[in-house]
């Protein structure tokens, strides 16, 4: 079998890091428009090890203001890929998000009931359902990551996450891929505040308290299942 992977969204932050860690093809949006089944079908003539689906409209505000477009990409795009991958007996690895949870309780496990707090989270959850329904061989990875720069002078001390920087999360995802894990998995690093995360790359970051009652302050994922499955593997 070919050891090469097919990656959608390869030009994004996560895709850029995965390209450095895996042998893969990363067609452009023009070459591989996931909303056009006829256009993407040609790429599946090759024998890939798996399809890694990253492409999405991930800007929450843009998604909320362009609901039809984000549904087309984030939901119907998943449907198109899952159906074709299933026809080819190809495993699909879908990168989902912690935004499928409301962010109120925290420590969300794979068995907790999703309840998205916004339209972006809804479309990503609907994408998960498309993968589950249309594909026989799948892995859904719920995770969250940050670019390698904290873009603000302050960071919240009372908002908690299991996210980490993209270079860290990309390596965790590659471990998951290479272990050929099936089904649903939450990937991240231990719970920390935004301030603690920001301090990892900027020691001069200032503290701030989030006083917005509607802001999701506990979106961290339970990663116990992942810790058991990953073992001591490193990239």
Question: What feature does the model see in each segment?
Answer:
Residues 23-43:
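Adenosine-cofactor binding site in Rossmann-like domains, unifying the SAM/SAH pocket
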Residues 35, 65, 69-80, 114, ...:
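Glycine-rich NAD(P)-binding loop of the Rossmann-fold in SDR/ketoreductase-type enzymes
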Residues 137, 143-150, 160-188:
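Alpha-helical substrate-binding/gating segment
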Residues 172, 179-218, 222:
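Mid/C-terminal beta-alpha module of Rossmann-like enzyme folds, strongest
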Residues 2-22:
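N-terminal Rossmann NAD(P)H-binding glycine-rich loop of SDR-like oxidoreductase domains
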Residues 87, 115-144:
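Active-site Tyr-X1-5-Lys
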Residues 80-115:
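Conserved Rossmann-fold NAD(P)-dependent oxidoreductase catalytic core, especially the SDR/UDP-sugar
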Residues 37-73, 84-86:
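NAD(P)H-binding glycine-rich loop region in Rossmannoid oxidoreductase-like domains
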